Amino acid sequence: MRETRRTPRPAPRYRPGRDRRAEFHPPPEPAAGTPPDPGTRHVVVVGGGIAGLTAALGLAERGVRVTVLEREQRLGGRVRSWPVTLPDGSTGQMSRGFHAFFRQYYNLRAVLRRTDPTLDRLRPLDDYPLARAGGGTDSFAGIPRTPPWNLVEFVRRSPSFDLRGLAAVDVEAALGLLDVDFPDTFVALDGVSAADLLDRLHFPEGARHLALEVFARSFFADPREFSGAELLAMFHLYFVGSAEGLLFDVPRDDYDSTLWAPLGRYLHGLGVEVHTGREVRTVTERGDRLALLHGRPRSTEQEWTEADGVVLALDPVGLRTVVEASPGLGGDADAGATWRRHVAGVRSAPAFAVLRLWLDGRVAQHRAPFLGTSGHGPLDNVSVLERFENHAAEWAAAHGGSVVELHAYALPEGTDEAALRTDLVERLHRLYPETAGLRSVHEEWLVERDCVLVGVEPWATRPGVVTPEPRLVLAGDAVRCDLPVALMERAATTGWLAADRLLTGWGLPGHGVWSAPTSGRFGALPGLARRGIGAYRALSARRSE
């Protein structure tokens, strides 16, 4: 089901960032009639990641009674962290890998501001370099934030673009990067992969790798299977459609102590009950309410909880599993059957790996805190954690070492984990030769496959926030959204939208969300230019016949 698109409008005075063209999307009008006492409404949020915590926040701030059920022992979902014991008995931290908190993540930042109004718990990184095999590094430092000057300056400076390569670019197709209008652009590129889109552009090989490494692989996806519309939305969100820039912030310490534990305490102060270590098994109707069966993972212990509304804020596997185990959810009519089929079609991305190393010596001082790579085999990026995380800095100072993290995205089926682990370390030694003589005093290895793959299937077949069951809404980065948002920001945005849907359906006020501009920054000019070039090409082709 497609959400009703409302005309964005600027909100008075407040701006979530520096971009004057950021758009505010108001919530639906509250349902007519006398609104209920919000305290008489109870919502169960299934999932304590970004989407679930955002939905819980949006509901609780309007007085609704909220219960959060989270399968893991800590909040944060796929952006959680947890303690590990190092060989000397001290405590280190592990996570599922590096996450960039971009300045255009307006709705996620709104959540974080509840406990950190000035976002002091985030620190900026000065650059996001990308090292290409065979030499050459792209850098985003010092590039203007405002389009089109950011694009012009990046192309001028980047070794990925040269005059010969630029001459081969299809100008008509390239103008499509600027000629966008979301959500219509999502539909227009149904069936087109990221690789197809770049084929149309005729980008130079270096620039093609840059686009795929910076955008597509960060979605844990093979570019031949990843949506071209999503890739175009990312170009828009991070580069040609937003004036916030491509540089980003990172938490000053581990995700749990910096972000989610403070938010958990804030939610507790609003009356939210958070239960970790609880896995929801099925959702069913019980009169005019919904009932959820939940228990400890891998345990026969279970209990029922009733609610007036339910938010499913789960990863693809969790969402598919709960809906499949809840035969009546969504109703038995055609709309319900179609919705359940769409949920079953949500795809999981290939697996990814994270290797964190506690080394007995220092990485060279000039190494970037975070380095993306292209053409370095399975190695996609390298993080030197003591450059930005306090706990890693303290360990490095005390032991004269470094804490380094290696990522490998979109692993092929049947990957030999032992061979991959060895390969990643060897690639690190080639990139940072000073590490070849260092010893790992501790290692943490993680392989997961629970991220969403936004494929080339029709955009309208992806399940959205709204479901055929008015008491049930979805949230998460696997959920379709009309706006040009992605990853953590899609999770937060759909969390706010899910809360607003329930609130306004009960006659209570919602919150609304912000986004980068939903259309190109240059009005009709790119579209006119594209059509002009297309007409000229068609005329030339007829003349040559």
Enumerate the language-model features and the residues they cover.
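Glycine-rich FAD pyrophosphate-binding loop
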Residues: A60-T85
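Mobile amphipathic helical/loop "lid" adjacent to a hydrophobic cofactor/ligand pocket
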Residues: L108-R109, R113-R114, L119-G228
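N-terminal Rossmann-like FAD-binding beta1-loop-alpha1 element of flavoenzymes
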Residues: G39-V68
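Active-site-proximal substrate-binding core of FAD-dependent oxidoreductases
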Residues: R501-E545
